[in-house]
Amino acid sequence: MSPAIALAFLPLVVTLLVRYRHHFRLLVRTVLLRGFRDCLSGLRIEERAFSYVLTHALPGDPGHILTTLDHWSSCCEYLSHMGPVKGQILMRLVEEKAPACVLELGTYCGYSTLLIARALPPGSRLLTVERDSRTAAVAEKVIRLAGFDEQMVELIAGSSEEVIPRLRAQHQLNRADLVLLAHRPRYYLRDLQLLEAHALLPHGATVLADHVLFPGAPRFLQYTKSCGRYRCRLHHTSLPDFPAIKDGIAQLTYTGPG
């Protein structure tokens, strides 16, 4: 490419960098810096975060553990977790619905799991599913450190596609009053349809889906709005520490056969 052509594209490149500077910062923190630290330490970011929690958080205090994870993400390494703003929305909805049984798809570091567990009424049960066994091991430690036992919070390591069909037979889950989709948005539609096919959503069940605007779940949103089985609402938010990057939590109420 000649210098003249390169100079012709320079204003466009500068414009894109300015317009998407927040996305560029996010890319640097979640991909470049994270990959470098993974190689340097031999540990994943969730494992490094848990080491920080062990030395800074109060065992048996889920609120303090959540605050410690927020501090780690803001001041040390970006964790790509739900964060306090979305967390308040999630806790409020869990408290309002008072579900007897909750299913979470995508445990990650256990952050949203703690949010749900501390908002549940006595006697409720939470099943949380994490595809990656190494990440699940970290989340298990976080959950137990917070003081939640296996009777209240059960962590299942495995892909949601394989776990959902086995929930009734192997985990005694006959219905999920509230479901949180917090794994990969491209799997949201598949897993929602699996929940429908296996009759795990009772009439009036609440389905919450994170990250429906960024990175986005357009097919999932289109399906829930057009299939006639859900009432839909969108809670507009943003990414933790990146207020300029808009995101949202979809709140669905199941009105189909249950």
Curated annotation (Swiss-Prot):
Subcellular location, record wording: Cytoplasm; Endoplasmic reticulum
GO molecular function: catechol O-methyltransferase activity
InterPro entries xref list: SAM-dependent_MTases_sf, SAM_O-MeTrfase
Catalytic activity of the protein: a catechol + S-adenosyl-L-methionine = a guaiacol + S-adenosyl-L-homocysteine + H(+)
Transmembrane segment boundaries: none
Disruption-associated phenotype: Absence of auditory brain stem response (ABR) to click stimuli demonstrates that the mice are profoundly deaf. Normal hair bundle morphology as at postnatal day (P) 5 the sensory epithelia are patterned into three rows of outer hair cells (OHCs) and one row of inner hair cells (IHCs). The bundles of OHCs appear similar in size to those of wild-type mice and form a normal staircase pattern. Hair cells are maintained in the presence of gentamicin, an aminoglycoside antibiotic that enters hair cells through their transduction channels and normally causes hair cell death.
Pfam families: Methyltransf_3 (PF01596)
Subunit and partners: Interacts with LHFPL5, PCDH15, TMC1, TMC2 and TMIE. The interaction of TOMT with TMC1 and TMC2 is required for the transportation of TMC1/2 into the stereocilia of hair cells. Interacts directly with TMC1.
Record family assignment: Belongs to the class I-like SAM-binding methyltransferase superfamily. Cation-dependent O-methyltransferase family.
Task performed by this protein: Catalyzes the O-methylation, and thereby the inactivation, of catecholamine neurotransmitters and catechol hormones. Required for auditory function. Component of the cochlear hair cell's mechanotransduction (MET) machinery. Involved in the assembly of the asymmetric tip-link MET complex. Required for transportation of TMC1 and TMC2 proteins into the mechanically sensitive stereocilia of the hair cells. The function in MET is independent of the enzymatic activity.
Protein name: Transmembrane O-methyltransferase homolog
Organism name: Mus musculus (Mouse)
